[in-house]
Amino acid sequence: MSNTPIELKGSSFTLSVVHLHEAEPEVIRQALEDKIAQAPAFLKHAPVVINVSGLESPVNWPELHKIVTSTGLRIIGVSGCKDTSLKVEIDRMGLPLLTEGKEKAVRPAPVEPATPSEPPQNANPITKTRLIDVPVRSGQRIYAPQCDLIVTSHVSAGAELIADGNIHVYGMMRGRALAGASGDREAQIFCTHLTAELVSIAGVYWLSDKIPAEFYGKAARLRLADNALTVQPLN
């Protein structure tokens, strides 16, 4: 048992980000309800981050917040906000303002002359891929942050694979596969036996009934083209 009453630890969570391109509350409500109806088990009462970087017209944040939460989604933060007055409104409602990794600005440090030095011999290599060579069972969730995920065995229904990069499954894929989880729209999904409950790339998803019949159970490659999922044979 720990000697301290609390303990702070770093962790990673995969969240859906709702990018708003329209400030009209009723338009947003209808669009969200349509999305939730497509995948209620996946989106009902889901925690989400609202990205407002695409909004140009004035935003009635209290009304917008009310509309989003009325659909059952739970807002845990707001990203992409550059408007000072909107930041004040968001903060007043107790929501954190988040900075997404790709938007984070870093001020370069002054460059000072330095003598060349040998690279450290014990430096840890950057992880490019997470490899899973055992079956992924129902209820299990595998996450590969900032890298690709390769599974060389079967993935059961009810299991979930999440990667910030690509996902490769060299076995029966019956669960859910979410590639490009941090927003990488170049990510892809590769399956030797595509029978997934859900496939998603950068938040754009298909449920199993949306997978074209000619690719179901076959070797397939999925990627985004013109903001829509596409599938082709895996040769």
From Swiss-Prot:
Residues 104-125 are annotated as: Disordered. It holds the Pfam family MinC_C. Disulfide bonds: none annotated. It comes from the Bacteria. Residues 110-119 have a biased composition (Pro residues). InterPro entries: CAP/MinC_C (IPR016098), MinC (IPR013033), MinC_C_sf (IPR036145), MinC_N (IPR007874), Septum_form_inhib_MinC_C (IPR005526). Belongs to the MinC family. Cell division inhibitor that blocks the formation of polar Z ring septums. Rapidly oscillates between the poles of the cell to destabilize FtsZ filaments that have formed before they mature into polar Z rings. Prevents FtsZ polymerization. Interacts with MinD and FtsZ. This is Probable septum site-determining protein MinC. The lineage of its organism: Bacteria, Pseudomonadati, Pseudomonadota, Gammaproteobacteria, Enterobacterales. The gene is minC.
